[in-house]
């Protein structure tokens, strides 16, 4: 499998980094990474990692302005793309076909080739414009996976919350997520809640 991973300047860089770490552990998955200019700043602020360290998690890293990159052409076969986190600017550009920069261009290619496109939009609150853009993209077949925390699995740390969101992203591509703590029914949930309460 060959996946394109885009990261933009919206807050939520830990989700993108954790996704890359997971994908790197999966045999047969080739990753192509594009970091927007502001993603580079956000990564350093939110993760403490350098751009070089994050880039090293991918098989191939493309410059954000390289419109001649392989992933800017539909003839370069991929299985899809995920943008995590996805800024509202990038989301709006994808919705309107305004492919400024390689992140948006690669997404435009995935759309026109009818491949799987997953966006992880990071903004709150959402305006009517944001919601309209997301609705139109959903109608085009784009998967929108907002990084919303789940509490039925009793997360103990921020890492637990990040892992859950990343597992849901991996699910969109039918890829395994070993760290996922999945819903196992009400009985298991109640037992976990009691255990959590006892520990507290």
Swiss-Prot record:
Induction: By vanillate. FMN binds at residues 9-11, 36, 87-90, 122. Its EC number is 2.5.1.129. Gene3D superfamilies: Flavin prenyltransferase-like (3.40.50.1950). The keyword Transferase applies. One of its GO terms (biological process) is catabolic process. Keywords: Aromatic hydrocarbons catabolism, Detoxification, Flavoprotein, FMN, Prenyltransferase, Transferase. GO terms for molecular function: carboxy-lyase activity; flavin prenyltransferase activity. It comes from the Bacteria. Pfam families: Flavoprotein (PF02441). It catalyses: dimethylallyl phosphate + FMNH2 = prenylated FMNH2 + phosphate. InterPro entries: Flavin_trans-like, Flavoprotein, UbiX-like, UbiX_pad_YclB. Disulfide bonds: none annotated. Belongs to the UbiX/PAD1 family. YclB subfamily. Homododecamer. Involved in the non-oxidative decarboxylation and detoxification of phenolic derivatives under both aerobic and anaerobic conditions. Flavin prenyltransferase that catalyzes the synthesis of the prenylated FMN cofactor (prenyl-FMN) for phenolic acid decarboxylase. It is not known, if phenolic acid decarboxylase forms a complex composed of VdcB, VdcC and VdcD. The term subunit is often used in reference to the operon, however there is no experimental evidence to prove the existence of the complex. This is Probable UbiX-like flavin prenyltransferase.
């Amino acid at each position: 499998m060959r996946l394109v991973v885009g990261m933009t300047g919206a807050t939520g860089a830990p989700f993108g980094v954790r996704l890359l770490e997971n994908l790197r552990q999966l045999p047969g998955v080739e990753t192509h990474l594009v970091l927007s200019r502001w993603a580079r700043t956000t990564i350093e602020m939110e993760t403490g990692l350098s751009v070089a360290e994050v880039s090293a998690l991918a098989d191939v890293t493309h410059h954000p302005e390289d419109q001649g990159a392989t992933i800017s052409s539909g003839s370069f076969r991929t299985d899809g793309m995920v943008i995590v986190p996805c800024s509202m600017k990038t989301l709006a550009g994808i919705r309107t076909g305004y492919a400024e920069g390689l992140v948006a261009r690669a997404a435009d290619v995935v759309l026109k080739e009818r491949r799987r496109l997953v966006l992880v939009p990071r903004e709150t609150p959402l305006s009517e414009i944001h919601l309209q853009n997301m609705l139109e993209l959903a109608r085009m077949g784009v998967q929108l996976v907002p990084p919303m925390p789940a509490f039925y699995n009793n997360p103990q740390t921020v890492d637990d919350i990040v892992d859950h969101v990343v597992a849901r992203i991996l699910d969109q591509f039918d890829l395994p997520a070993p760290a996922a703590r999945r819903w196992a029914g009400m009985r298991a949930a109640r037992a976990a809640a009691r255990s959590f309460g006892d520990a507290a």
